[in-house]
């Protein structure tokens, strides 16, 4: 249920399960920390969060901040009930009683925090600002800037917030011995929403003509909406399960309501599963490879031919070959096991490398988006210059662009071997002397 809510009702595109990345491991440790939190094994919360920071400093860092906000919120909004006051967790008490575990968490967190802090230490302020603008406003705005979020994503997240609010109010009916546990989890989600609210404010400031705009852009790099995409579905889904358990204990009517809810959730999950598997291509290829809604066979054929050309490249080119590749793909390195000059999906993190990446995008990706001929709009001498500049040995382009050019390309076509054979993709080899 959590994965469905995260996949369908996220605001900023944050996923928890969907690929093998450092943040997936970080979320595992965040979940372990939350498990320790609700089981009142507070000493283990901090090492788990430290491990999360070590794998992904933003995931672990925002989770830590959300938890600290939750604990501080408990101190501010203390219950008037004496029994509940004894159950509530004091931040000061936690830090005093578990100082060693907190220190261990900080040391682990430093493993993930120091590398990004040191990466840009030599970059000048102008380069850092330019890199922030590229990252926030040009490349990742759909994850970082509220105004770039689609209306459907905002509407979906509002629905999720309504579910979350309903769950929070219903959980008050749980017995007192467990209410504090759920209150901490709900408070953690609210803490993540407070972080997102700060991101909303920064998004607004970044779009104003003021001296604070540049500073806001720099701060928006840190994914202020990320943790809410995780924490709110997590709290809502676990709360829904708790509510169904509560209903089950309330006689026949409650059991009927609980059963109906479980069946409805199962049917929704089944429908989503069927919808996701209606296209057999991996999601990375679904997202970028050419698709034709009115011609599924052409879509499947394009995917098969993409696999074929990548397999040919893997088996027939030197391991140190470097390719200029099509914009409409993000899996070349995965299938072909070769490097490429630039890819829209592969964004470096240090400031100078990001500026260099943006220049490559300008020369090699933007032309593919502006013109039907893509890179074939360049004359051969210009393609040769770009190959020399970036050390490219091969050019991979769609067949349709080759078919549209009026003057034959002077570069040697190596795939398909017979130029008369038509394939979805064509590989040209740059002259060795030019590249060297």
Model-identified regions with their sequence ranges:
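Membrane-interface transmembrane helices that cradle and orient dolichyl/undecaprenyl
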Residues: 25-44, 77-86
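Signature aromatic-anchored transmembrane alpha helix within multi-pass, membrane-resident enzymes
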Residues: 103-106, 246-282
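Transmembrane catalytic cores of multi-pass membrane glycosyltransferases
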Residues: 57-63, 72-228, 232
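Hydrophobic/aromatic-rich transmembrane helices and adjacent perimembrane loops
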Residues: 217-246, 255-258
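Aromatic/acidic, Gly/Pro-rich catalytic loop(s) in extracytoplasmic/lumenal soluble domains
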Residues: 381-436
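Membrane-interface micro-motifs in multi-pass membrane enzymes
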Residues: 1-32, 37, 223-234
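Membrane-interface alpha helices of multi-pass inner-membrane proteins
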Residues: 34-36, 44-63, 68, 104-107
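Short periplasmic/luminal acceptor-recognition loop of GT-C membrane glycosyltransferases, typified by
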Residues: 298-370, 384-402
């Amino acid at each position: 249920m959590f994965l469905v809510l995260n996949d369908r009702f996220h605001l900023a595109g944050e996923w928890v399960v969907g690929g093998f990345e450092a943040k997936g491991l970080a979320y595992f440790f965040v979940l372990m920390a939350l498990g320790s939190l609700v089981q009142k094994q507070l000493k283990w919360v901090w090492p788990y969060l430290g491990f999360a920071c070590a794998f992904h400093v933003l995931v672990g860092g925002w989770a830590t901040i959300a938890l600290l906000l939750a604990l501080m919120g408990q101190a501010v909004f203390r219950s008037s009930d004496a029994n509940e006051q004894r159950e509530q967790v004091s931040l000061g008490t936690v830090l005093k009683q578990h100082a060693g575990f907190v220190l261990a968490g900080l040391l682990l967190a430093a493993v993930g925090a120091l590398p990004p802090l040191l990466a840009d230490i030599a970059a000048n302020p102008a380069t850092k600002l330019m890199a922030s603008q590229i990252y926030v406003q040009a490349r990742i705005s759909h994850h970082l800037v509220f105004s770039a979020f689609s209306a459907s994503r905002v509407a979906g997240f509002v629905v999720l917030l309504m579910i979350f609010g309903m769950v929070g109010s219903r959980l008050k009916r749980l017995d007192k011995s467990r209410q504090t546990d759920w209150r901490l989890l709900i408070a953690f989600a609210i803490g993540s929403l407070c972080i997102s609210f700060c991101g909303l404010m920064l998004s607004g400031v970044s779009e104003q003509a003021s001296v604070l705009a540049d500073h806001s852009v720099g701060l928006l790099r840190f994914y202020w909406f990320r943790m809410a995409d995780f924490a709110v579905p997590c709290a809502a889904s676990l709360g829904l399960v708790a509510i169904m358990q509560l209903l089950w204990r309330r006689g026949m009517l409650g059991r009927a309501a609980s059963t109906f809810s479980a069946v409805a959730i199962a049917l929704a999950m089944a429908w989503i599963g069927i919808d996701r598997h209606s296209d057999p291509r991996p999601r990375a290829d679904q997202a970028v490879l050419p698709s034709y809604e009115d011609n599924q066979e052409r879509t499947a054929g394009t995917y098969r031919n993409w696999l074929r050309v990548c397999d040919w490249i893997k088996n027939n080119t030197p391991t140190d070959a470097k390719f200029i590749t099509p914009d409409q793909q993000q899996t070349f390195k995965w299938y072909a096991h070769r490097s490429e000059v630039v890819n829209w999906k592969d964004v470096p993190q240090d400031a100078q490398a990001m500026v260099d990446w943006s220049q490559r995008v300008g020369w090699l990706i933007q032309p593919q988006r502006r013109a039907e001929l893509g890179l074939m709009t360049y004359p051969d001498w210009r393609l040769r210059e770009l190959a020399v500049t970036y050390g490219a040995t091969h050019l991979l382009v769609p067949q349709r662009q080759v078919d549209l050019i009026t003057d034959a390309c002077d570069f040697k076509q190596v795939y398909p071997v017979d130029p008369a054979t038509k394939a979805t993709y064509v590989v040209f080899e740059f002259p060795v002397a030019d590249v060297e």
